[in-house]
Amino acid sequence: MYYIENNDKPRFLENMFKIIKIEGNKLILPLKTKNINKKYLVKLARKTKKILDKTKSKKIVLSKILKENEEYKNILYSYGFDIVDGKWLFEVISCEVLDYIVNLKNIKKEDTEISILVNYITQNTLENIKKIARQYKRLNIVTNHIEKFKKIEEELYNKEGIMIIVNNNKKKSLSKSKIILNIDFPKELLNKYNIYENAILVNIRGNMKIARKRFNGITINDYEIKLNNLDYSQINNKNQYNIRDIYEASFYKTMPYREIVKQINADKLEVTSLYGNNGAIS
């Protein structure tokens, strides 16, 4: 796994010959942040690929600045690189994200209706639903696959006494939910639902905006964390990377859920910020 960042003040020869510095498992690109030529980006991406092909590494973490460069990212994606974006971890810690929201907004858990929007079930998703249902007694699962989730609803109730409601009523399902956790609904599908106008919407997979004019709530698309038992200062000495990306990169995504949670608890993960369309929520 490699980290990639830019040097916005490269020396003349570094810039001219597009020399990529290699420092351990870190690549430093001679890339200024303004007026970047697309051809220059293509050449840098090709050089990046040549270097990483020799290492047989496909997983990469981009610095905050490089993540904003869609051209460079898309070229790397086209080469088949796995660019860590924090979304996998976002779902894994979704219960911690909900706790952060209720504490920040001074919301009582027992009075809060949570809705989870999900169509595709994974082991992590299932375990998270169980975890959230144990803490929030009013939990809706909104899905297009009613039959699949009805089986899960019955199994949770019969085996663990956990009660959830599975439904897909576009007019009523989200009309009273104070917090909505969107696991995998695309924007086009989400905007077909009648959403509580002051809801807090957490989008796990990517940036999204509610199209309805009457929606006055908060849309959360991003987050940051800290790890009280880990020190990333050697990698992130200039705060050029998101901690959540560095941390996600340390996991094998095929790890059993129990082992993932055990590691997160040992590292004392803490959600520090949630970001909406207009910056950090407060």
Where on the chain are the PLM-derived regions?
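Short, charged/polar "capping" segments at the starts of alpha-helices
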Residues: 66-73, 125, 146-153, 188-190, ...
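Adenosine-phosphate binding glycine-rich loop
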Residues: 200-282
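Rossmann-like adenosine-cofactor binding region
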Residues: 163-228
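A glycine-rich, Thr/Ser-enriched phosphate-binding loop motif common to dinucleotide/cofactor-binding enzymes
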Residues: 83-99
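Metallocofactor- and cofactor-centric catalytic cores in central/energy metabolism, strongly enriched
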Residues: 5-74, 277-282
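Glycine-rich phosphate/diphosphate-binding loop of Rossmann-like nucleotide-binding domains
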Residues: 104-171
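Well-ordered, non-membrane alpha-helical segments in soluble/globular domains
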Residues: 37-51, 95-98, 125-129, 133
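Structural motif
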Residues: 4-7, 31-32, 62-66, 117-120, ...
